[in-house]
């Protein structure tokens, strides 16, 4: 009986030891699962952040390049206007003025040259008259002697970018003017904006601080965007507070990036102040396109 009791105790001890080993094994497996899940979450978060950083960095580089090209175009054309202004001040002969401007047009490629009044009326060198519906208070800016760049659309013509240089009054063919200006179709300006990012699937915009669009170089959009901030208010997932912060960043000429959802599509948005007329340049690309592009690079 004593031997039997000892055997039972030994058997019970083995069962207890086996149970503990089984419990430790289960605990170890559960711990490994928890660790693996934690690592997976951290890895997914790391990959997501890496994709975000790489994509926004690429967009920022392309945007910065376009920004520099736009600033150079503005600088160059404002310089041309000052040269033309100097010529006009020293040349009273109107036939000579017309020949000079027409030659300059052939050399530089602008659409037209305008003798411009403070309220937007104009005369060309050929004597054609009309009205430039400009997007700003021309009178106020000319009064401050500012060089101006803004967009306009004449009846029956495509959108144009207009460069304006103030002048201390002048007269051409009896038309009294307060400034001279040259224009380019937006298509000519768009060639300066590098849209090579992500196989040409990134949209570019140039906007005023209040969101009005100066240049729209969007892709895969059916509707024209007239005001970028208004578009965000209507279609994005951004709160009013976030939109206000973004508007302030545009007004201050700041640079930055963020994720934004428009309708059912998520995008990366990057922006950079241009130092031209308080404009901001924007780049916008779908996250799906970014992820697909990076998958091709990684795999």
Describe the predicted segments one by one.
Residues 232-298:
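Extracellular/periplasmic juxtamembrane segments that couple receptor/chemosensory ectodomains to their
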Residues 117-122, 208-212:
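Short acidic/glycine-rich beta-turn/loop cap or linker motifs at sensory/regulatory domain boundaries
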Residues 118, 122-196:
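Extracytoplasmic/periplasmic ligand-binding sensor regions of membrane-associated signaling proteins
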Residues 94-108, 179-230:
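Solvent-exposed, extracytoplasmic
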Residues 81, 111-116, 202-205:
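Short, hydrophobic-rich beta-strand element in sensory/regulatory alpha-beta domains
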Residues 100, 125-155, 221-259:
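Extracytoplasmic/periplasmic sensor domains and loops in membrane signaling proteins
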Residues 16-93:
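Juxtamembrane extracytoplasmic/periplasmic/luminal helical "stalk" adjacent to the first N-terminal
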Residues 2-18:
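N-terminal sensory and localization modules of signal-transduction and trafficking proteins
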